Regions:
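Acyl-CoA/ACP chain-elongation machinery
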Residues: 186-232, 265-279, 304-311, 326-376
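Short, well-ordered amphipathic alpha-helical segments that serve as non-catalytic structural scaffolds
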Residues: 82-93, 147, 246-248, 278-293, ...
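Condensing-enzyme catalytic core mediating Claisen C-C bond formation in acyl metabolism
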Residues: 10-14, 37-42, 219-299, 411-412
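Flexible, low-complexity linker/loop segments at domain and module junctions
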Residues: 1-13, 97-102, 294-296, 373-412
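Conserved catalytic cysteine-centered active-site region
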Residues: 2-9, 41-84, 104, 113-177, ...
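Conserved small-residue
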Residues: 15, 33, 86, 107, ...
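ACP-dependent fatty acid/polyketide chain-elongation machinery
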Residues: 1-71, 93, 249-261, 349-363, ...
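Active-site-proximal alpha-helical scaffold in enzymes
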Residues: 82-96, 144-147, 152-155, 161-195, ...
Length: 412
């Protein structure tokens, strides 16, 4: 997907909203990124239950005013996080909700898992108290499309509304698909992003795979350590990220402030294995995103989940695509952990905040980096610098690979 063309077909980012373990305001999150401050904490109940992995990057909206009962009764945390992030994004974009009450406005919000808690809670109630005590609205709270559906109902969205469910690329796919719909002339504005909730049983399942970090429970802020020699798995996380995407014509017509242009999007499937990342697939998605030409990116926000295999395969992909001229890159997961289907959206927002504020966040590697990263331009400590073009990479189970290319807006 290339972005250059008429104002109607060019796609720009005009609003950002986030719910994360780093905070729920853009300035708080940007400050945490710049300071290298981790949002990962130990979860005491997981220690008590004997989980091997006892750390998480847990988001919270407890300090945020709830929605009306009319809407809250249909929301689990996946939808709730997404709806708050969407509200923040619309406020940031200065876009009146009335503008969404049109078949030209949509919501595409990815989620890798959905709201598992609702299934478990309903089953527990039915088993312990009887079937007649089961809450009536479990299905809309738990269905895989709950995030996009709840946002559509909350804001009266009249256009496209659906949820990409493609593991850890779900949020990136939402951004890419939204951009494609706008570019094709099917939508004028789309709320796009991803959301994921934490649940004990979801953690248990990843723990059973040996996918999660378990060696740093006593030092949780060091547990997610992309590219470290002693990394031992990813740190599960939760939260949401929503971007307001508009056609350039729509944004200019209302005098919107523009963060960036979606300059490219790449998506592909690698068939090397269900849970095995593979450099050729990651590289293919990157190439598709970059196929419109233009300058080499100044910065790459890597997926780098802090897994022994995933980090190295992505390094191989970077070398394959850029050769000896790999751009500066870092992984923000060292501070946030891995929020699964929300990661692509949150990391696009992190990248745009760095672009806005003129810095590149460092990577929480620890003292000893993997030999595979030797000689590569990994940014280990936060540094000031202008980002004109950035690439954000995502990949996940099932071989799904995605990349989003973002150009800083210069008013042209």
């Amino acid at each position: 997907m290339t972005a250059f063309g008429s104002e109607a077909s060019r796609v720009v980012v005009t609003g950002l909203g986030i719910v994360s373990c780093l905070g729920n305001t853009l300035d708080d999150v940007a400050a945490a990124l710049r300071a290298g401050r981790s949002g990962v904490r130990r979860i005491e109940t997981w220690r008590q239950r004997g989980f091997r992995s006892q750390v998480a990057g847990a988001a919270s909206v407890e300090s945020v005013a709830p929605f009306s009962r009319k809407h809250e009764r249909f929301m689990g945390d996946t939808a709730r996080f997404a709806a708050h992030a969407a509200t923040f994004a619309l406020d940031d974009a200065r876009l009146d909700a009335d503008a969404l009450r049109s078949p030209r406005a949509g919501a595409i919000v990815g989620s890798g898992i959905g709201s598992m808690a609702e299934y478990d809670d309903a089953m527990a109630i039915a088993t312990q108290r009887g079937l007649d005590k089961t809450p009536p609205y479990v299905v809309p709270k738990a269905m895989s499309s709950t995030a996009s559906a709840c946002i559509a109902q909350l804001f009266g969205i009249g256009g496209v509304s659906y949820t990409p469910a493609s593991a850890c690329t779900s949020g990136a796919l939402a951004i890419g698909h939204a951009a494609q719909l706008i570019r094709a002339g099917c939508q004028d504005v789309v709320l796009a992003g991803g959301s994921e909730a934490l649940h004990d049983n979801m953690t248990l399942m990843f723990d059973a795979m040996g996918a999660l970090s378990s060696a740093f429970n006593d030092t949780p802020d060091c547990a997610s350590r992309p590219y470290a020699r002693d990394r031992d798995g990813f740190v599960i996380a939760s939260g949401a990220g929503i971007l307001v995407l508009e056609s350039l014509a729509h944004a200019r017509a209302r005098g919107a402030r523009i963060y960036a242009e979606v300059a490219g999007f790449g998506q592909c499937t690698d068939h090397a294995g269900m849970a095995t990342p593979h450099a050729p697939g990651i590289a293919s998605a990157m190439r598709i995103a970059l196929e419109g030409g233009g300058p080499r990116p100044d910065y790459v926000n890597t997926h780098a989940p802090s897994t022994p295999l995933g980090d190295v395969e992505e390094l191989k992909a970077l070398g394959d695509v850029f050769g000896s001229d790999v751009p500066a890159f870092s992984s923000t997961k060292g501070m946030t952990g891995h929020p699964l289907g929300a990661s692509g959206a949150q990391e696009a927002i992190y990248t745009l905040l760095m672009m806005r504020d003129g810095f590149i966040a460092g990577t929480a590697v620890g003292s000893d980096a993997d030999p595979a990263v030797a000689g590569m331009p990994l940014v280990r400590d936060t540094r000031d610098g202008t980002i004109e073009r950035a690439l954000s990479i995502s990949f996940g189970f099932g071989g799904s690979c995605a990349s989003v290319l973002l150009d800083a807006w210069k008013g042209d």
